[in-house]
Structure formats: structure tokens, C-alpha cells
From Swiss-Prot:
Crosslink site: Glycyl lysine isopeptide (Lys-Gly) (interchain with G-Cter in ubiquitin): K485, K490
SMART domains attached to this UniProt entry: WD40 (SM00320)
Descriptive protein name: Cell division cycle protein 20 homolog
Residues recorded with modification Phosphothreonine: T70, T106, T157
GO cellular component term of the entry, any: perinuclear region of cytoplasm
Organism field: Rattus norvegicus (Rat)
Biological or metabolic pathway of the protein: Protein modification; protein ubiquitination
Gene3D superfamilies (UniProt xref): YVTN repeat-like/Quinoprotein amine dehydrogenase
Residue(s) carrying Phosphoserine: S41, S72, S92, S153, S161
Amino acid sequence: MAQFVFESDLHSLLQLDAPIPNAPIARWQRKAKEATGPAPSPMRAANRSHSAGRTPGRTPGKSNSKVQTTPSKPGGDRYIPQRSASQMEVASFLLSKENQPEDGGTPTKKEHQKAWARNLNGFDVEEAKILRLSGKPQNAPEGYQNRLKVLYSQKATPGSSRKACRYIPSLPDRILDAPEIRNDYYLNLVDWSSGNVLAVALDNSVYLWNAGSGDILQLLQMEQPGDYISSVAWIKEGNYLAVGTSNAEVQLWDVQQQKRLRNMTSHSARVSSLSWNSYILSSGSRSGHIHHHDVRVAEHHVATLSGHSQEVCGLRWAPDGRHLASGGNDNIVNVWPSGPGESGWVPLQTFTQHQGAVKAVAWCPWQSNILATGGGTSDRHIRIWNVCSGACLSAVDVHSQVCSILWSPHYKELISGHGFAQNQLVIWKYPTMAKVAELKGHTARVLSLTMSPDGATVASAAADETLRLWRCFELDPALRREREKASTSKSSLIHQGIR
């Protein structure tokens, strides 16, 4: 009986159509169970595997981790701004600024305000980031040198900067004939008015050339044979022309009416230099005396200055009218006050360093106490003086006779005219006195220089009987328009009356 029971059990085991008790669960059952419920204990699975004598389905002692899935709800952003570095005040200012009307400040004022804000805040408010994702970099240690230091300059550098040097034409813009001009170093034969009219003395006549229209007019001609014109000078307003003659006369002409207003005779020798200071006309003669004429009154001769022993060939009032500079054939430069002192008319300064006749005298237009003088053939020097202290600021050997000096009102430069051997015009940089350019073309010595009212053109009269116009101080068009708008017309004091 027991044999039949054993066979029945063996047959049921070999059929394999029933689940095996205590056997490991199938893989598909395990996967389904893991998806719906907690995973089975690792120890229990390991025990079942070893009890059955089969290879385990997973590493013993290692838990079966759950598969990572994308969360259904969004989490926080990793890019969180730092509250300490956030420009919350700037954000509030910019939001409130949108509702405010724009002020009518000038572009220059806005640029200054922008530069101040950049220096104070360390950044541009208009372009500042409100939220910062990281802190500012640390400053460089003290004394650290960086080759790119220019990138961290306090001052904003423009994207494009204009070249420091400018173009100076080496050829004259125009050449005019000046026949019978007297080849005399001591005379002053050309002057340019504020009305853009050039006066030229040719022997015994005075001609006027209108630079705007090109018209030429003969203003006067001496009546006596042998007499000639020795000097010309326009009043500042440009309506009246003073003419010095070889017969010791000073004539005053109304150019618009082409009429001589008066003839002033107080000198004893030819009048070789003239200079205006409002209604006071100063004249220097071969006798060495300087006379002041008040053209408003009948008794015009109001003062006599005696500071030279030979001919006064250079005479120029300062732009502010406080000082008068005179240069003579006695190699002396005197600086006179505008009025007499306690001891009368005495020079404030007397300079004796020149070794030749001093015809070239010119005042600096932007610094009223600076005077430039040039000596003749025996001296060949240009000297810069401080008339307040009496000090010679600089002296340059130009290796030729100096006939005239002019300052440029647009550039910190001056131009000088020279004689033998090259008869050239030289532009100098102030205060270094470095040579900027040389303008050549005259075949004989330069006698006189004068400047156009806009300060862009220099006219040079030379012994080769030519008058050359050099556009050596041409102004930038944008800057010229600004200065033209800022300039104001002044009424002439001469209209108070000329008798």
C-alpha cells in the first residue's frame, strides 16, 4: 500500500503542471508584484534561492532601488539671484523714472552727469543689471600692475578718437600781386579788418581787397611826389583805417564813405607803426617817440611816450587794453601801462636781451600777460616774456631775421615770418616752441604778416612783390559753427563822435 502512495507522489511531482511549493516565484510574477507592492525582503529571497539550490536572481544583500521618474510637480529654479548683490534701489529708480518727464539738459551736461554717476556707483545706472547671479570679483592687490590697466580707467574712452595732428597745406591758397611794395623792414604795410577787408600799402597808395567778394578798391594816393605810406592799421570794429605816412602824418579814413575824416600831425618823422586801443590810436615814429591820439576830440594828442632812442618799428596793444608793447631799432622792448603813473609815463618792463631791431611783437590772445617778440638779422631769436614778472619764459634761435609774429586764437600755436635765407613762414607749438610746419614759397624776405578775422588764414607780404594767403589754421567745421553761434556783435565806441 505504501508503495502505491510513493508512486502517486512521484508521478504528481514529475507532471510539472502544478506550482512547486517553497519554490522561488517566477520573474514575471516578481516584476508585477514590485510594481504594485513593496519589494520582498532581501534575506527572504536569498534564503529561498539557496534552499532551492538555484542561481539567485539578484545580488544578495543589495536592495532593489526604485526606478527614478520625472516628478509631476515643478521644483525650484537653481538660478537664484543673490539678494545682497541685487540692485533693488536701481530697479525702483528706473521704474519711477519712466513716469517722469525728461529734463531739457544739454548733451554736454548729460554726459557730465553720466560720468559722475559712473564714478560714484562703479557702474552705468542705465545699463546696470538688477539681478546678479554671482558676487563681484575681488579687487586686485595693492601695487598690482596690469598691462590692460587702460581698460579700467575712470574716464570713459570714446570709441573713435580724432588724430592729434592736423593737416596744414604747404602751398598758399591764393597769390596776389603787390607791385611797388616798399622793401623796408621797419614798415608795417598790411592789415586785415574785422569786416574781412585787407588793406595793403603799395608805395604811395593804399588798396583795399574784399576777401569775400574779391573786389579791389584804391582808397588813397599821396599827393606829393616822393611821399609814401609807411603803416596801416584798422580799428577793431573795421570801419575806419588809420594811415601813417612818410611826412609824419597820421590820417584817419572812413572806408565806407571813402573819405578822409582827419589829418593828425604831431610827429617829427615818418610814422612806421600804429595800434588801436578802443578810441585811442597809438603811433610810433622814426624819432623814437610814441604818441597817443584820442580821435574823439579836437586836441587829439593826449600823451607822449619816450622810451626808445631809435625808430619804433613794432607797436601792439594787448587784447585787454591794459598794456602796450613797443619794439625799436635800438634792440629794446618796452611794456607800457594804459595810463600814466605817479611819475608819468614810465615803462613797466624793459627787455634788453635782443641783439637786433625788434619789429615783431604779439600778445597771446588767451593769456594777457604773455608777450612774444622777434629780433632782426643780428639777433634771430624769438623770445616769450611774462610781462608781470619780467621773466623770459623761452628763447628760440630761428637762424633768420624775424619780421612778424602772430598767435592763433584756435590753436595754441604761433606763426612767424622770416627773411634770408629761406624766406619762410614757421608755425610753432606753444609753450614747447616745437616746430610744427614750414611754409615756403616767397623768393624774397617776408615783410609783414596779418590774420583774417576768422583766424584761419594768414596773409604774408614779401619783398618779391607778392601777397600770399595761407590757410594754415583752418578750424574744424563743427567747432566753427559753435563759435559762430556764441560770438556776439559789439557796437563800436568810435560812433561816439569823430571830429
